[in-house]
Amino acid sequence: MPNYRKLGKLPPKRHIKLDRPQGESHLGEGIYYEHILTTVGFDRAYSIMYHLRPPTRVRAVERAGEVKLEPAEEMPLRHVHLRTADLQRQGDAITGRIPLMFNDDLVAYRCRPAAPQETLYRNGAADEVIFIQSRGGTAETTFGRLRYRRGDYLVMPRTTVYRLIPDDLGQEDYLFLEARGVIRTPARYSNPDGQFLLGTPYSERDFHSPTELNPVDDARDTVLLVKVGTRLTRMTLAQHPLDVVGWDGFVYPYTFNAWDFEPLTGTVHLPPPFQQTFECDGFVICTFAPRYLDHHPEAIKVPYAHSNVQADEVLFYVEGDFASRRGVGECSLT
């Protein structure tokens, strides 16, 4: 995320006490409990949170299964069109994910849940991009409550505890991307001061972080489902983990809406990098938003044939018509 945010109660400096009335505090210690979330070791962005209770207390740990990534049978090299609009609803926003494609850099899932997400979830080893295909809802997270709507990219940094609460369960529809690296905006979009350049396809105003903290003061055991790689672990914590009273930093969940993307056009066809939205280790995410087609008087208003031999290209169709494809529909993947 491009800039610093803060929410809730904070002490004036890092690593000093944030006092609270001793009668209200855990074991009468009179403090809130500092918790630092770092990325890339200690070398990149981080955030500092303050909990009602120590976030380290775990009552029990048990295996909870595995997400199996089984490659399809060996087949001839060919184009693929997956129609996913009518996938049968199953599970919840976590257990209902169906893996469709994967490599060493990411896993792509479709998810049309049949049940509400009851158990809190944390991906311990991957950033997640959750594209909201239908309706909206609220994400309850370590960093507070965050509204999402149709067309949002909901970016969830690794280790964030969250639960998705849709406005209409019957319309809940997601595309999940699970990333080995850190999801970020393209470096070329920012000036040396960290601000988006004029002329980039979005600005800081288009990114939305949690605006409301609702710390849960609950000392009862709470179940948390944790995913690391393909392995699932069920942890029983000694308190509710969404008990943060304040945080600040550069790591937090946020939304960016595809309809806020400001597409670039040219006299002739521009290649996909001009529509780039995010980057990560080994892949990029582009948004092909509605835009004027090429306006050179002799322009051929369809993309030229090209061989992108060092990358796989996957398109997810949200709505509308796409100039270079026929026969696709909403929620098609090619």
Locate predicted features.
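Jelly-roll (double-stranded beta-helix
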Residues: 1-334
